[in-house]
Amino acid sequence: MKYVLSLDQGTTSSRAIVFDEKGNVVSKVNKEFRQIYPRPGWVEHDPVEIWESQIEVAKKAIEEAGIKPEDIAAIGITNQRETTIVWDKNTGKPVYNAIVWQCRRTAPICDELKEKGYSEFIRERTGLVIDAYFSGTKIKWILDNVEGVREKAEKGEVLFGTVDTWLIWNLTGGRVHVTDYSNASRTMIFNIHKLDWDDEILELLNIPRAMLPQVMPSSHVYGYTAKDIFGVEIPIAGDAGDQQAALFGQACFQPGMLKNTYGTGCFLLMNTGEKAFESKSGLLTTIAWGINGKVYYALEGSIFITGAAVQWLRDGLKIISNAAETEELATKVPDNGGVFFVPAFVGLGAPYWDMYARGLIIGITRGTTREHIVRAVLESIAYQTRDVVEVMEKDSDIKVETLRVDGGAVVNNFLMQFQADILGVPVERPVVNETTALGAAYLAGLAVGYWKDQEEIASLWQLDRRFEPSMNSEERERLYSKWKEAVSRSLGWEKR
């Protein structure tokens, strides 16, 4: 029997998961690595540590599954997106640490681009807003600030890659320098309509084309692992950014299908098919994946603070000792007691885009209890999700019929039920919650014929529980309009 190995390289840990042909988890190994903060607002990783931790867990996962490397039909890769690595082509050594997606050091470069009026130019071509989050300005920073790198880049002696590219390059012993459409679409230098690096943006940021990887479909045999790694050559056949991989793992193959990943923040992606919709509400237009000679697009909305607000209840207010308690506490009261919580700890993302908004708790009376505060925090996750779903429907003109969910918080039945109630559509929780790794496995398996087609994959998707909306529409709209009112009071607070 054959299996698929998924390498899930995340922001805080490297993971490897072995899946069988039914999409079930056979083994799973995780290893955390260092977060490096050289200055306030700067975040780095050591690329060598990323590679070493990833290969260590890969070998362990095969061992723990009780199988041999030759039993692996293909390897799929999924990764933290936007994080930028530049390395020497000849020695394979990084010229600088990986600059992580969270790193804000290039904000001044972004401000300058915006001041010069390039926002629309960048958005039309890349589907993105100008922000330090994306790879483009990070590459420029390395070229401008690390001695000797620019000269080498002009000669094609250094290479750029997002994390997937770095892993594939190392897995193939330096033979293959590629990325996929989904990861390329997060760099801010890739034209998502022409499906190529954008020469005018490269000129604007002064990035030599010679250092960039070849862009390929997300399901494709890119190359084979070097023999000295696993003792056999295994095809590397799937590659997608983490959020896009989760959309694929949730089998959201039809336009209008939508998933929400509940983590520290939330990421909503809606499949929009072969059409790239331009957002009027500050959502990102991104590539979902490239497969079978076609490219599929998605709208993406990110919510900064969701699970992080629950962590704040635990570590900041110390009114809970773990996240699991929140469900029981929230259900001890019949409603939120008029309390609303806006988790604008770092401003608000889509659709408000207000960096000066700050958190608030409003509606407090003498009768307010710990339970009401906890419930208000959980409810805020659902309200923020509705904020994004509403603008997605408006931008795409597609009505959402169901929401598929994954991530840590989906075990909270109260939250899932309230999410269905406040959206007015069913929420579907799958049996396999490892949707990101599963998506990468599916992409790899499809490329080597391990799975036949997307129909087969859609049939493997198993429902754990479906939450039907049970709230009447008057109550739903009453709560939601109160939420909107609470948000309006948090906006611009830092500047007032």
UniProtKB/Swiss-Prot annotation:
The keyword Isomerase does not apply. PANTHER family: GLYCEROL KINASE, SUGAR KINASE. Inhibited by fructose 1,6-bisphosphate (FBP). Sn-glycerol 3-phosphate binds at T11, R81, E82, Y133, D242. This is Glycerol kinase 2. It catalyses: glycerol + ATP = sn-glycerol 3-phosphate + ADP + H(+). SUPFAM superfamilies: Actin-like ATPase domain. Keywords: ATP-binding, Glycerol metabolism, Kinase, Nucleotide-binding, Transferase. Belongs to the FGGY kinase family. It is an enzyme of class 2 (transferase). Key enzyme in the regulation of glycerol uptake and metabolism. Catalyzes the phosphorylation of glycerol to yield sn-glycerol 3-phosphate. GO terms for biological process: glycerol catabolic process; glycerol metabolic process; glycerol-3-phosphate metabolic process. ATP binds at T11, T12, S13, T264, G307, Q311, G408. It comes from the Bacteria. The lineage of its organism: Bacteria, Thermotogati, Thermotogota, Thermotogae, Thermotogales. Pathway: Polyol metabolism; glycerol degradation via glycerol kinase pathway; sn-glycerol 3-phosphate from glycerol: step 1/1. Its EC number is 2.7.1.30. GO terms for cellular component: cytosol. Glycerol binds at R81, E82, Y133, D242, Q243. Disulfide bonds: none annotated. The keyword Ribosomal protein does not apply. One of its GO terms (molecular function) is glycerol kinase activity. ADP binds at T11, R15, T264, G307, G408, N412. Pfam families: FGGY_C, FGGY_N. CDD domains: FGGY_EcGK_like.
